[in-house]
Amino acid sequence: MKKKLSLLLAMTGAAVLFAGCSTVQYAGGKELNGQVITASGTSVAHVSGYASGLYLLSIPLIVGSAENPDTITFGEDSVNVTAVTKMVTKKSKELKGSKTIDLVSMTGSTNIPIPIPFIFYWKTATVSGNSVK
């Protein structure tokens, strides 16, 4: 019984340690130092979005919410390019950009070998682009 309880506590601790997160950040105005970041239109900002989370095989457990950045959610599959792109373009629109160009994305998945290999995965997705008027 104590062994099972210890394992449960260890797994809970690992889940909290690897709790999902999401964020959207931007650099605009003075952060661009007067540089033009696009060949057409007026530069508004460079916007970057990130989401990560813990998965059991392909089932999302604790992930960062793409709907509400900087919060976590349970069971929502938001660690993918589609969800993070929506997060980036939403922020671009909030910054009064009429379009988001030069989108670049990256995804990653890392196996967590404890307690059983190839069961738990840490997934990440990043998208960035330039907001212009």
Map each language-model feature to its residues:
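Sec-dependent bacterial lipoprotein signal peptides
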Residues: 1-21
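Surface-exposed short loop/turn segments
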Residues: 23-26, 94-133
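Bacterial Sec signal peptide processing site at the extreme N-terminus
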Residues: 15-37
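Short, well-ordered alpha-helical segments
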Residues: 39-110
